[in-house]
């Protein structure tokens, strides 16, 4: 099997690291070809890597298991990012135009680039969910083609501590594994579980992990809020025990 025949993704969880290889069909469905996991409770807590060496060793083991099943070498992998430091913040970018101008995609791209460049101390913007654009008195999801001398872009930025991504990079480099891209784990899971109708009408999606619980809120098919609570399946029974 050639490396281009399958896609590999790795999720760094607080209880286990999971690797999966699959083949995407024309209808968008995924056929699972291989699955492997390693316990991570000793070196990943609340989704944050605490021991780089042990994490790299587990990654190497998972890749070997997947390659053994696939009978092929793995070139690149997609990596899921989650954990306690993941959260959302809002930002607004305003552009005053010299005269009434038809809003172009280039202008929207420029506004989005400006939003990406907003400095956040010790944090990194991982993903952006555009909320809406205010043109005059109207709130629009897609303002391209609308004439105006003023536009206000409202964004929901998904951020995490810079060290989160840096430590992931170090572990994969130590393991000799190339990263194809990063995936925001809560978004990927919500997209796999929720329908467009559910996200459009409005819903809350809750994912209970071992050490954390992630809450995502959708409305009008747009992510409106994301938060990670430092409470999971492994800790909640202790908290729920009655006091003596």
Ranges and model annotations:
Residues 172, 240-241:
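Hydrophobic alpha-helix position signal
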């Amino acid at each position: 099997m050639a490396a281009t025949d399958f896609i590999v993704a790795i999720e760094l969880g607080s209880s286990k690291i999971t690797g999966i290889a699959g083949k995407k069909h024309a209808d968008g469905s995924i056929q699972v070809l291989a699955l492997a996991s390693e316990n991570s409770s000793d070196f990943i807590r609340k989704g944050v890597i605490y021991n780089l060496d042990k994490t790299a060793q587990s990654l190497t083991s998972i890749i070997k298991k997947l390659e053994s099943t696939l009978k092929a070498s793995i070139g690149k992998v997609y990596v899921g990012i989650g954990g306690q430091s993941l959260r959302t913040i809002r930002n607004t970018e305003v552009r005053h135009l010299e005269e009434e101008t038809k809003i172009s995609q280039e202008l929207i791209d420029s506004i989005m680039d400006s939003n990406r460049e907003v400095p956040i101390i010790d944090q990194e913007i991982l993903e952006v969910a555009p909320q809406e654009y205010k043109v005059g008195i109207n709130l629009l999801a897609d303002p391209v083609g609308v004439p105006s001398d003023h536009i206000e872009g409202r964004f929901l930025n998904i951020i995490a501590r810079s060290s989160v991504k840096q430590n992931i990079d170090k572990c994969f480099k130590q393991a000799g594994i190339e990263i194809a891209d990063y995936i925001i784990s809560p978004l990927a899971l919500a997209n796999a579980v929720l329908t467009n109708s559910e996200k459009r009408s409005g819903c809350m999606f809750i994912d209970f992990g071992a050490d954390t619980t992630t809450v995502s809120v959708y409305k009008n098919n747009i992510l409106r809020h994301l938060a990670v609570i430092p409470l999971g399946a492994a800790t909640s029974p202790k908290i729920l025990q009655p006091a003596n």
